[in-house]
């Protein structure tokens, strides 16, 4: 039983698909996808549930969400184990994701009260009231890199605001999506408030095309996000929130401070989660000269020693495999293409068993037309530069704008960087992959439109209703010109 529709677990009627553990290619989940007809059943179930769900008080909806939070906490180790088996991420990392699932719920609740809710004031004898109302049925598309944590940042704010949800996990991580829905079920969520549809591309197309949804919340690749944007063209009545990827630059200056601390910050930025975070550093700008040379030498030495292994290995690895062999082959093909364009590998990424790829670093300084692509994996491009102004200009030469970072102890360099860089997340002397759940998450350009973090998700899960109110109608002492009573 792979689909959860109207509170019932039912078998999919579409094509069979499987989830393979990327570190050994073992099948960890098997089922059939939802057909277009089943997707419509899920949307209709969500529409029917919306009538009662939106009428509940905020306190009642919040209590249901908190019950889910307790389920997450009680089952955190199972969540971590499932995510590790399905994504290949090290167990230490998936345990942090399980904890973040619960932590993001508290942020979402606070955000609802601070950014939405109801407020009123008096002006010129009128009560000016601001209320917020749910949009209706929200489709949520989840990614594979954080299959528990990131969908939660959409689903919880949507439910708190009074919406109902149809959730489609990534076809790479159906097991995690199924487990999350079973925890909602255990929390006592009324039937139809969340509906789960599993499947691949065809299931996703059917959900996005459904006339019964009022909005779509998406985290995933830029290519899929752009397809959704075109699909929603001419439908201003539907809300579309896109959080996509980035070709993220990290600039190091001669004033980088401690050498090992800088190397560690780069490694955390480029290779954590095997490079499968949308905020990972893809382009590393290092100054020409002795200090830059020393940094590269140390970075190469440290990267060669990174432990790459299956998630349950002892001692624990720093990173695991790519999500699939296809994803691994994409990284190797990208490396080969950059080499053919004139790039020089400082460390060559190499294929291992199943979906494993070792970290790669390639100097692309001599490539005249550097491809503006997101290489979603452990492949770091190095560019040598002469001036900070040149580095920032090169860093901004991308259609993306998700994250960027500067490593420098010089306040003047930081001020120049933060004034001229184009990105939604800009860090100083911290890893690019570090982001706060109560800060906006997203960026301009091809990286998306809205800010789908837990805190700012409240902004697009409800619409504001402005009212001017009085207890009775009023007749002014002086009527408007041309009016006689």
From Swiss-Prot:
Catalysed reaction equations from the record: N-succinyl-L-glutamate 5-semialdehyde + NAD(+) + H2O = N-succinyl-L-glutamate + NADH + 2 H(+)
Pathway(s) where this gene product acts: Amino-acid degradation; L-arginine degradation via AST pathway; L-glutamate and succinate from L-arginine: step 4/5
Class of enzymatic activity (EC top level): oxidoreductase
Source superkingdom: Bacteria
Keyword Oxidoreductase among record annotations: yes
A Pfam family recorded for this sequence: Aldedh
GO biological process, one term: arginine catabolic process to glutamate
Active site positions: 243, 278
Keywords in alphabetical order: Arginine metabolism, NAD, Oxidoreductase
Record-stated family: Belongs to the aldehyde dehydrogenase family. AstD subfamily.
Listed NCBIfam families: arg_catab_astD, PRK09457.1
Descriptive protein name: N-succinylglutamate 5-semialdehyde dehydrogenase
């Amino acid at each position: 039983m792979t689909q959860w529709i109207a509170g019932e677990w039912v078998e999919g009627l579409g094509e069979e698909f499987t989830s393979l553990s990327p570190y050994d290619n073992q099948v960890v989940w098997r089922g059939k996808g939802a057909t277009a007809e089943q997707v419509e059943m899920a949307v209709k179930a969500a529409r029917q549930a919306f009538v009662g769900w939106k009428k509940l008080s905020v306190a009642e909806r919040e209590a249901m969400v908190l019950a889910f939070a307790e389920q997450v906490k009680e089952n955190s180790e199972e969540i971590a184990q499932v995510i590790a088996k399905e994504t290949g991420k090290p167990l230490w990392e998936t345990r942090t994701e399980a904890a973040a699932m619960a932590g993001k719920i508290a942020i979402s609740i606070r955000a609802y009260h601070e950014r939405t809710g109801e407020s009123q004031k008096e002006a010129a004898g009128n009560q000016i009231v601001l209320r917020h109302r749910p949009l209706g049925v929200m489709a949520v598309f989840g990614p594979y890199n954080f299959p528990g944590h990131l969908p939660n940042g959409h689903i919880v704010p949507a439910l708190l605001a009074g919406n109902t949800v149809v959730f489609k996990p990534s076809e790479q991580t159906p097991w995690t999506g199924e487990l999350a829905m079973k925890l909602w079920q255990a929390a006592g969520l009324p039937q139809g408030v969340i509906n789960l549809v599993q499947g691949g591309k065809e299931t996703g197309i059917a959900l996005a095309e459904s006339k019964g949804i009022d909005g779509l919340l998406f985290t995933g690749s830029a290519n899929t996000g752009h397809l959704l944007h075109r699909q929603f063209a001419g439908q201003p009545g539907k809300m579309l929130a896109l959080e996509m990827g980035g070709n993220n630059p990290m600039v190091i200056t001669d004033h980088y401070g401690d050498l090992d601390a800088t190397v560690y910050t780069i490694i955390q930025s480029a290779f954590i989660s095997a490079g499968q975070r949308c905020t990972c550093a893809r382009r590393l700008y290092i100054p020409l000269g002795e200090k830059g040379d020393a940094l590269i030498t140390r970075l190469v030495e440290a990267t060669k020693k990174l432990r790459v292994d299956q998630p349950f290995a002892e001692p624990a690895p720093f990173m695991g495999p790519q999500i699939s062999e296809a994803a691994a082959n994409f990284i190797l093909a990208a490396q080969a293409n950059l080499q053919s364009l004139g790039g020089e590998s400082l460390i060559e990424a190499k294929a291992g068993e199943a979906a494993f790829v070792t970290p790669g670093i390639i100097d692309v300084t001599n490539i005249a037309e550097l491809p503006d692509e997101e290489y979603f994996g452990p492949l770091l491009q190095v560019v040598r530069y002469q001036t900070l102004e040149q580095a920032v200009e090169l860093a901004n030469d991308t259609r993306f704008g998700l994250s960027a970072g500067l490593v420098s102890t010089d306040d003047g360099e930081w001020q120049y960087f933060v004034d001229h860089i184009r990105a939604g997340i800009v860090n100083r002397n911290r890893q690019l992959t570090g982001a706060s759940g109560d800060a906006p998450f997203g960026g301009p350009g091809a990286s998306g439109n809205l800010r789908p973090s837990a805190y700012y998700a409240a902004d697009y899960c409800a619409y504001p209703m402005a009212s001017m109110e009085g207890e009775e109608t009023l007749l002014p002492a002086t009527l408007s010109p041309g009016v006689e009573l």
